[in-house]
Amino acid sequence: GVDADLIDPDGYYYPVTTTPLVLMGNADYDNMPSDWTDLTKDEYKGLYQLHNLGGGTAKTVFASIISRYQDPDGDLGISDEGWEIAAKFLGNAHNIADGEDAVGSVIDGTYPMDEHWASGVLTEQKDRDYKFQIMTPDIGEPYVVESLAISAGTKKYDTCVAFLNWLGSSDVQLDWSNNYGTIPCQKEALDQVSDDIKELMETLKPQDLDWSFIAENVDAWVEKAELEYVQ
């Protein structure tokens, strides 16, 4: 079975894997924030790295922050406070440039924090023989769910269903996880994943996000942010 919280409420998409988006930190860094919004404080200026807002990780993290400040009368549906948070969050960050070793910068302390996708954190820990700190906000982390859907009107509906049932089976999902470090949505597979995935997932929980509101506005939010706030 699959966690009901991960299923598309309209029933169009079949969830396969999930990717929590996290802030990882240098193992010895002693001032880890408790939430993304803490990074707006002056004490964190120049100490964390953000990816380009055009990418999925950065865009989703950004949306998960400012969507907390919904205001129907605000600019693009966001309150003045929300845009102040956005300006400080983006302005305090080091923007990762092409070719930079962002993970290496976390390890050597140049920039002791970095936004990252959870499976990537696990891969980097294994490849670099290093254990990162992970921020765990009370509000939870934004989860991205990789899903598949069947095209309307297909003449091979039964074949598609069989493929989805095969791909989503516990055996296939566990094998995929063991080979590529993915985090399965399938509960039986998740119960059998490697210890490092289990350990990480036990500390994380999905943030409750208004995905419809985000989908309607995120491109406009990113455009405004890139024009006005990204340093």
Protein language model regions, located:
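Ligand-binding "clamshell"
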Residues: G1-D10, E124-T136
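Extracytoplasmic ligand-binding site segments that recognize negatively charged/polar headgroups
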Residues: G1-T110
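Periplasmic-binding protein-like
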Residues: T19, E84-F89, I96, R128-A152
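A residue-level marker of the well-folded mature domains of exported/periplasmic proteins
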Residues: K45, R68, H94, E124-I134, ...
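A ligand-binding cleft/hinge motif common to bilobed small-molecule-binding domains
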Residues: I107, M113-K131
